[in-house]
Amino acid sequence: MALSKSKREVEEEANVILRQIVYDLSSACGAFSDSDPRVHVAYHRAGPRKQIFFEPKNTRAAIVTCGGLCPGLNTVIRELVVGLWELYGVRQILGIQAGYRGFYSTTRNPLVLNPKMVRGWHKLGGTVLETSRGGFDLHQIVDAIQTNAFNQPMGTLDQITWFSYCFSSSFGLPSVRCDIQTFLQSHFLQVYIIGGDGTMRGAVEIFDEIQRRKINVGVVGIPKTVDNDVGIIDRSFGFQTAVEMAQQAISAAHVEAESAVNGIGLVKLMGRSTGHIALHATLSSRDVDCCLIPEMEFYLEGKGGLVEFLDNRLKENGHAVLVVAEGAGQNMIPRTAAQTEERDESGNLVFLDVGSWLKTELKKWWARDHPGELFTVKYIDPTYMIRAVPANATDNLYCTLLAHSAIHGVMAGYTGFVSGPINGNYAYIPLEDVAQATNAVNTKDHKWAWVRTVTNQPDFVKS
C-alpha cells in the first residue's frame, strides 16, 4: 500500500538542512558573512512527503551498481527493493546487471527483484547485481532508459508541486524542476544509481541528457566509496566497515613486527586521493607508529625523514608498524613512460604499489646503514579482503536510511539528486554538487593532530 500521512510522520518542504554549521564568530560579520559561498546554502530535508506523484502499480524502478566493490552494496539494493515494495507498493523493480553497460547489454538481462528474492542479501559481500568499471556509453544508456520508461504519474497539474532552483535572502534550496506538461503526457521510470565519485559524474551526464531529451525520468544517486572521498555528505557507506576490517590487518602486522628482530609491519590501505581509512584505522588501532596519506607529502632520507624516524623507533622498541594509503608517495615512485600513461577502465591513472616500493626502499636502507644486522619487513595488503566483506551493523543501518531517503525523494517528485546525511540530518543534494565536491583529509584540523599525537611521527616538513 502506498505511503500515507496517517501511516507515518512526513517532512514539510520548509524543513531544510544547513550545509555549514560552524562559523567564525571573530569575523566582522560572523555567521552572516557573505564571503563564504557555503554559508547560506541549505538543502531540502529528506523523508516522506504528504503527496506522492506516481501510481505505484504502474511505477517501474531500475537499480544499478557501478565501480569497485564496497561493503553494503547488497544492503542498499535490498532496502531499495523492500522500501519500494512495502512502503509504496511498487511491484516493477529491475536490477541492472554489470554496471552501466548492463543498460544496453544484449547478454546481461535485468533481474526482476522482489522482497523474497533479496531477503538475505544484506548478509552478503559484493553485489549480487554484479558490477564493472567503464562501459559508460551515455547515448546507449539513455536510449535504453527511454525505451523502458513507461510509468504513469499519479496526480493532476494543480496537485503536483515541482521544486526549482530557488534562492531566498537566507538560503539557497537546490533541487530540480521538471516540465509539468511534458511530464503529464509521458511515462516515468525511476533510476537508482549506486556508485562512487566517477559513477556520480556519470549520473550527472545521464540526468543532463534526460533533461535535454525532455523525457521525465527520476534519477537518484546513492554515493558509495570505501575511501570516504565523496564530498558534502558526512560519510559514504562501507567506510566504517573498512576501518573495522583494517584493524585485523594492522593487528597482524603488529604481531609480525613484534615477533621479529628489528621487524617492521607495513600495511597498505585503500585511499587513492584521500587517507581517511588510514587515518581512522590508525586512531582506532593505537599500534601504528607512522601513518602516510596522499594529503601529506613525505620523504625517506635526511633529517626528519621516514628512515630516520623508523631507525629511532627500532632502537627504542625493536619493532614498528607503518600504515600507508595507496595514493601516498605516488610522485616518489619511478615510472616508465608506459606506466605514466596507463589508465584503468574508468579512466583513472593506474597507481603503482606504494607498499612494495616502500618495502624495497626500506630493505635497501637497512642493508646500506646496518649491514649484517637482522631486519625484516612484513607487507600486508588487505584491499580485496576489506572490499569483499558484508557491511557491519553500523553500515547496514546507514545503508537502510540512505535507500529509504532516496525512495521518498523520487516518489515525492525530486530528480537529479543524491540522498545523504549532512551534519547528521538526511538531505536531498543536487547530483552535480556531489559530483564536483571532494572530501580530502584536512591536515590542519584536529583529527590529523590526533594522529601526530598518537604516533609521534614527524611532520615531514624539510627545514
Residue ranges and their predicted role:
Residues 1-12, 50-104:
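N-terminal phosphate-binding or glycine-rich loops at protein starts, especially the Walker A/P-loop
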Residues 1-16, 338-463:
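C-terminal non-catalytic interaction/assembly regions of soluble proteins
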Residues 144, 155-156, 193-195, 201-205, ...:
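Accessory alpha-helical/coil subdomains and C-terminal extensions
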Residues 13, 19-55, 101-160, 171-189, ...:
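Glycine-rich oxoanion-binding loops at beta->alpha junctions
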Residues 66-68, 95-101, 133-134, 158-159, ...:
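Short, ordered loop/turn segments at secondary-structure junctions
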Residues 52-57, 62, 86-88, 119-123, ...:
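Solvent-exposed alpha-helices and their adjacent loops that cap or buttress functional pockets
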Residues 56-64, 99-102, 120-129, 145, ...:
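Gly-rich Lys/Arg/Thr-decorated short loops/hinges at beta-loop-alpha junctions or inter-strand turns
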Residues 70-80, 103-104, 136-141, 156-164, ...:
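Short glycine/serine/threonine-rich phosphate/pyrophosphate-binding segments
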